[in-house]
Amino acid sequence: MKATVNIQDQFLNQLRKESIPVTVFLLNGFQLRGQVKGFDNFTVIVETEGRQQLVYKHAISTFAPQKNVQLKNEAEV
């Protein structure tokens, strides 16, 4: 049986593990620049200048990392 690949979780986990700087665009146009410190099914913790913010995923439009994120292919999962 194949395991389901969750691209969102892989992407956010790589941002977190590699401490990749990211710009988070919210639906209201606001931008957060920082690092992903953690996430769950509904929220993401973004740290900016030593301060953490809990952001609900439904308020997020886009994650724009400063470098490409390497995702595992299906054979590696």
UniProtKB/Swiss-Prot annotation:
It comes from the Bacteria. GO terms for biological process: regulation of DNA-templated transcription; regulation of RNA stability; regulation of translation, ncRNA-mediated. The lineage of its organism: Bacteria, Bacillati, Bacillota, Bacilli, Bacillales. This is RNA-binding protein Hfq. One of its GO terms (molecular function) is RNA binding. NCBIfam families: Hfq, PRK00395.1. The gene is hfq. It comes from Shouchella clausii (strain KSM-K16) (Alkalihalobacillus clausii). Keywords: RNA-binding, Stress response. The keyword RNA-binding applies. RNA chaperone that binds small regulatory RNA (sRNAs) and mRNAs to facilitate mRNA translational regulation in response to envelope stress, environmental stress and changes in metabolite concentrations. Also binds with high specificity to tRNAs. The keyword Nucleotide-binding does not apply. GO terms for cellular component: cytosol. PROSITE patterns: SM (PS52002).
